[in-house]
A protein has these predicted regions:
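Nucleotide/pyrophosphate-binding catalytic subdomain
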Residues: 1-243, 248, 340, 416-418, ...
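A conserved regulatory-domain signal marking ACT and ACT-like small-molecule sensing domains
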Residues: 269-438
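Short helix/loop capping segments that flank catalytic or ligand/cofactor-binding pockets
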Residues: 44, 174, 212-213, 259-261, ...
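Internal glycine-rich alpha/beta core junctions
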Residues: 123, 261-263
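Positions that flank functional sites
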Residues: 135-137, 208-209, 266, 333, ...
């Protein structure tokens, strides 16, 4: 049995969290290869180290004195070192980092949180430190070079029984430090799990897995103990943020389960993510997630269905502006294009002008206060009447459905409602399928 064990920013925020990690590692000898993020917030008003590093880079870029920002960063690491009684000469490394700041790229600067954290963690656990820049390789198109990365990881696996590995970065095809998107430490852990053929990828954070709904909307929502990759992808895409959605693909391809666990409550069951889960939750749905601030463009044209390529023309206009499309619900003579407001706001009027000129619609309207809520669950396809029950519940609660979209795999029903009805919609769906479990 081999586990890749990744700890997020809240799990490495201070010396006390380091101690919890050591206890977790010592409880299970299969936790041999550890990935860490940069230290996160210790309390609500605190700063994440990565945020401070981005701020440090901005000061450097605009020639503003950055000494006060650097001091905050340095003190965090020294505090961890001193409280744990470590010998790592991290002060010298940090000072050298600051001295050479102007010669560094943004990627190098913002990746140092993981780098320094991994160095301290390696000493504290008595494990080897393996630098991600020597292992993870990107291609010119910024995708992972799996062959090169896997070969380098296998070599380190043969060399060390245990090591600590910094998340979030690797090396580009040109030999420079390259970072993943924010939260990319999850991706690093998934890469290690795939390349080392792990049996489980453990992802430790500050919550006990996924919940069936947002706890800021639904009071004490039930936890999700088992979920498929497909369900997770749907929920993550719509805003359920425990795991970086791009971390799913490497382990899904290798059929490796992900186990989301809580560093502060290691006894909790957490959430197991695997492609084919035989465990039934007892509910027709797995979870509910949603996002606000979408825009819907409605296009109506008489006899549209007789015009070959009519919808394609609209999509090609949006493609020219690099606009990603969320949904395209359609009828015989009309269709809606749903996009995120922030993607289209700057170019909206130009795009509408192109639509009028090239599509010559009989009606063209825009609704810009849309929220999307997805109800997700592999069990829905086995339960006739699920969508009818959902729509009926919303109607009974005077929530007007502006848009409906259902995936062909029948694990997701997405409804569009006015932004003002977002919270109420999530609550009603939860109460309908979970609160009053049949």
């Amino acid at each position: 049995m081999l586990k890749i064990t990744k700890f997020g920013g809240s799990s490495v925020a201070n010396a006390e969290q380091f101690k919890k990690i050591k206890n977790i590692i010592q409880q299970d000898p299969t936790r041999r290869y550890i990935v860490v993020s940069a230290p996160g917030k210790r309390f609500a008003a605190d700063n994440k180290i990565t945020d401070l590093l981005y701020l440090l880079d901005a000061h450097r870029k605009y020639h503003v004195d950055a000494s006060s920002v650097f001091k905050l960063i340095k003190n965090r690491f020294i505090e961890i070192k001193n409280e744990l009684g470590l010998k790592q000469p991290i002060e010298k490394e940090l000072d050298a980092f600051y001295t050479n700041l102007n010669q560094m790229s943004q990627a190098v600067i913002v990746s140092r949180g993981e780098y320094f954290c991994a160095k301290l963690m390696a000493e504290y656990l008595g494990y080897a430190f393996v630098d991600a820049k020597d292992i993870i390789r990107f291609k010119l198109d910024k995708s992972i070079d799996w062959d090169a990365t896997s070969a380098k990881l296998q070599a380190k696996y043969a060399q060390y029984d245990h090591f600590v590995f910094p998340g979030f970065y690797g090396t580009s095809a040109n030999g420079h430090i390259q970072v993943f998107p924010r939260g990319g430490g999850d991706i690093t852990g998934a890469i290690l799990a795939k390349c080392l053929h792990a049996d489980v990828y453990e992802n430790w954070t500050d919550v006990s897995g996924f919940l069936m709904a947002d706890p800021t909307i639904v009071q004490n929502p039930k936890g999700i103990t088992h979920i498929t990759y497909s369900e997770l992808r749907e929920l993550s895409y719509m805003g359920a943020s425990v795991l970086h959605e791009e971390a799913i693909f490497p382990v899904k391809e290798a059929n490796i389960p992900i186990h989301i666990l809580n560093t502060n409550r290691p006894q909790d069951a957490g959430t197991i993510i695997q492609e084919h889960s035989k465990i039934k939750s007892g509910y027709p749905i797995t979870g509910i997630a949603g996002k606000k601030d979408f825009m819907s463009i409605y296009i109506y044209k008489k006899h549209m269905s007789n015009e070959v390529g009519y919808i394609r023309k609209a999509l090609s206009i949006l493609e020219k502006y690099h606009i990603s499309i969320e949904h395209i619900p359609s009828g015989i003579d009309s269709f809606n294009i749903v996009v995120e407001k922030k993607e289209i706001e700057e170019s909206l009027y130009e795009i509408l002008a192109h639509f009028k000129e090239e599509l010559k619609p009989d009606k063209l309207t825009v609704q810009d206060d849309l929220a999307l809520i997805s109800t997700v669950g592999k069990n829905m396809s086995d339960k006739p009447g699920t969508s009818g029950k959902l729509f009926g519940a919303l109607g009974k609660n005077n929530i007007n459905i502006v848009m409906i979209a259902q995936g062909s795999d029948e694990i997701n029903i997405t409804v569009g409602v006015k932004k003002k009805d977002f919270t109420k919609t999530v609550q009603v769906i939860y109460d309908t399928f979970v609160g009053g479990n049949e």
